[in-house]
Amino acid sequence: MAFVLSLLMALVLVSYGPGGSLGCYLSQRLMLDARENLRLLDRMNRLSPHSCLQDRKDFGLPQEMVEGDQLQEAQAFCVLYEMLQQSFNLFHTERSSAAWNTTLLEQLCTGLQQQLEDLDTCRGPVMGEKDSELGKMDPIVTVKKYFQGIHFYLKEKEYSDCAWEIVRVEMMRALSSSTSLQERLRKMGGDLNSP
């Protein structure tokens, strides 16, 4: 009986220790996946951005939100998750498939999905019962509006090659910012279960 209690205590300590939290540690793998996704987006370039200058648009990336220090840990996690989810949704469409090299697009979608799955292990413990409440908060709404603007732009431009190129460049900016946000979360302790 003493052995079982010792084992249970060890498991509890490991789950709340610096390397534990039952899988909610923002790993280096998550950062590597993020960098690989940026590399894939760069490789997806089919047109010179200079040839699409007439189609440029400021989508209003909420930079201060993803790069500033104004968000608390749970909010930052929600913003990161929403940015990755919306990026995945943007590239995981029929219209997107018609615009890009299929192999690179599949690799990008797989990479984004992997990041989301890695974050999903933390979503429940970090969000708990606050999930529905946080889903309505201003930063999440801002991210959703940002991506709605991108979808509207593509539709307005009839999903032209230049429109997709402008969006590709914009998504490189957005995912680069989300990588900065991931790094900030990691520096906050990395352990998303910690109070």
Curated annotation (Swiss-Prot):
Additional information: IFN-tau genes are intronless. They evolved from IFN-omega genes in the ruminantia suborder and have continued to duplicate independently in different lineages of the ruminantia. They code for proteins very similar in sequence but with different biological potency and pattern of expression.
Signal peptide: 1-23
A GO molecular-function annotation: cytokine activity
UniProt keyword list: Antiviral defense, Cytokine, Disulfide bond, Glycoprotein, Hormone, Pregnancy, Secreted, Signal
Record family assignment: Belongs to the alpha/beta interferon family. IFN-alphaII subfamily.
Primary role: Paracrine hormone primarily responsible for maternal recognition of pregnancy. Interacts with endometrial receptors, probably type I interferon receptors, and blocks estrogen receptor expression, preventing the estrogen-induced increase in oxytocin receptor expression in the endometrium. This results in the suppression of the pulsatile endometrial release of the luteolytic hormone prostaglandin F2-alpha, hindering the regression of the corpus luteum (luteolysis) and therefore a return to ovarian cyclicity.
Gene Ontology, cellular component aspect: extracellular space
Glycosylated residues, chain numbering: 101
Disulfide bonds: 24-122, 52-162
InterPro entries per record: 4_helix_cytokine-like_core (IPR009079), Interferon_alpha/beta/delta (IPR000471)
This protein's name: Interferon tau-11
GO terms for biological process, alphabetical: defense response to virus; female pregnancy
Entry superkingdom: Eukaryota
Tissue: Constitutively and exclusively expressed in the mononuclear cells of the extraembryonic trophectoderm.
Main location: secreted
Subcellular location: Secreted
